[in-house]
């Protein structure tokens, strides 16, 4: 029974044995009920993926054979020295980022995702697990399929005792993202892929074990994230996973929140932070490490370490710190004139305006827009939201006049912290952990696809500066 229970270990539950027994029974019932949903008339996610992947693998094989020698772009020297920005060199099936339009998940914009994906009863926000299904298969699941997937993820949420003890032993002043990466790495003990590979499983079966690891990991992430949050900022105790709740609701409740609107925020947050094509640090790192046939646990842990950087996922924490400093210095004067002066002072001091600009986007990030619309709906008069709104009115003009950015518009990090602050989740150093839970929803489907289509290990070519000089001299002498 332990393989299908969603309750976490007794060592950190605050409920008694009777409550735990009830949760065990609920988990069993929910999983059996989910299997009924899927077996009656609907395919499970694994069944559906197994059905469609042979044709996809053949499509890729044929495409490479017929067009493998086609030139798809050129590489400039400045790109080699500039973080490979803009170089076409990765395959990422789940999403594509358009500079003007923003992200599309399997061809769908964020507003389309918000309209079309299944939702929990009474909710207006899409279910993150429905997006996981879409990213993996390219198809929108039915309500019954999502309900079965929600129950499956809840049933996989139990955390090994050694991981709990490890988290409890970590110093509270260790950054939550470091703790998150440590815990995910420690879950390698549970890897079905690693065990199967050690036993010589056929390459054709790699994807199946990667799928199982990915769903196991996804099911455990809300518990790990919440345990870190409760250890560092609260009393260390968390409740158990609700076997009948969806992914976003379980995350909210494990963190200690029952507010209906906050639960909806978690659904939205996890959805829009999940995927942003494959070239960003966390997605690329997860894919890169996975290409060496490291398990999903080790691959995601590596991606989380990249996400923890201040130039990537930790930017939302830095935005909030900057907002607080701004608020303190302007002393309640949120006029456009005051904000504009503060922005110019920031830029003239050689600092950046956090939350503005993006490596690819050249318009307002639609993820920012989705969060802004949520705030307008739920708390239009909130002080911090009003401040962010004023900055939104002023900053693009200031940044354009400053002339040192290609994109003067806000990105996703410019808004997310304000939403969390409103609902009382004020510990900014934890925000990137939530980002990490969301990012798993985007990167794990690609790992499964990589193994299913036999993607090779990643190995680009590197040159030293001297070698590049030789190459440039040779090229220029021919022109």
UniProtKB/Swiss-Prot annotation:
Its EC number is 2.3.3.1. It comes from the Eukaryota. Phosphorylation at Ser-462 inhibits catalytic activity. Dephosphorylation at Ser-462 by PTC7 enhances catalytic activity. InterPro entries: Citrate_synth-like_lrg_a-sub (IPR016142), Citrate_synth-like_sm_a-sub (IPR016143), Citrate_synthase (IPR002020), Citrate_synthase_AS (IPR019810), Citrate_synthase_euk (IPR010109), Citrate_synthase_sf (IPR036969). The keyword Transferase applies. Disruption phenotype: Decreased growth related to mitochondrial dysfunction. Gene3D superfamilies: Citrate Synthase, domain 1, Cytochrome P450-Terp, domain 2. GO terms for biological process: acetyl-CoA catabolic process; carbohydrate metabolic process; citrate metabolic process; tricarboxylic acid cycle. SUPFAM superfamilies: Citrate synthase. One of its GO terms (molecular function) is citrate synthase activity. The active site is at 312, 358, 413. Its main location: mitochondrion. Keywords: Mitochondrion, Phosphoprotein, Transferase, Transit peptide, Tricarboxylic acid cycle. The modification Phosphoserine is found at residue 462. It is found in: Mitochondrion matrix. Belongs to the citrate synthase family. Citrate synthase is found in nearly all cells capable of oxidative metabolism. Specific citrate synthase with catalytic activity only with acetyl-CoA. Monomer and homodimer. Exists as an inactive monomer when phosphorylated. Homodimerization is dependent on dephosphorylation of Ser-462 by PTC7 and is required for activity. This is Citrate synthase, mitochondrial. The lineage of its organism: Eukaryota, Fungi, Dikarya, Ascomycota, Saccharomycotina. The gene is CIT1.
